[in-house]
Amino acid sequence: MSVYVLALFIGVVAGLRAMIAPAAVSWAARLGWLPLQGTPLAFFGFTATPYIFTVLAVIELVTDQLPETPSRKVPLQFGARIVLGALSGAAISGAHGGLAGGSIVGVLGAVVGAVGAVIGTLGGAKVRSSLANMFGRDAPAALIEDVVGIVAAALIVVSMHGF
């Protein structure tokens, strides 16, 4: 599978749940499946990074269930998803095409990751709204979205092993 397809998919995950994408990427980097050493994104592989992103992802999963949580489409939420999708996409594509020296591969991965985040944000909101209408409440739809995001991120990370 192309690194750009993986970058797009991790961007979609960021659109669904902003912190799951960098958590997955940081675990891949920490496990040595994503060679980011010596690149500007090497921090993804630092010892504490996967734990920090995982804690943030769990907090996001919990707070998403709260009724006072703002829409993912408000500028701050939307912007964060785009930035995290871009960073995650750059890490995936750049690790396999060389990020050192500002490689175009990492830049293209960032763009593709950002596009994926927009797709995931808008598409995820639409699907969740439809599911919530079908179930008559939001909680089951949110849980389905959580599972889809986690499983997709895990599949993306596993597909990078031995890439």
What are these regions (language model features)?
Residues 83-95, 109-126:
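Mid-bilayer segments of alpha-helical transmembrane spans in multi-pass integral membrane proteins
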Residues 129-148:
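Interfacial loop-to-transmembrane junctions
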Residues 154-163:
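Juxtamembrane boundary at the C-terminal end of a transmembrane helix
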Residues 42-55, 103-119:
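Structural signature of hydrophobic alpha-helical transmembrane segments
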Residues 60, 80-89, 145-150:
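Core segments of transmembrane alpha-helices
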Residues 58-74, 122-134:
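C-terminal ends of transmembrane helices
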Residues 72-83, 138-142:
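Cytoplasmic-side transmembrane-helix entry/capping segments in multi-pass membrane proteins
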Residues 9-29, 149-155:
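The first (N-terminal) embedded transmembrane alpha-helix
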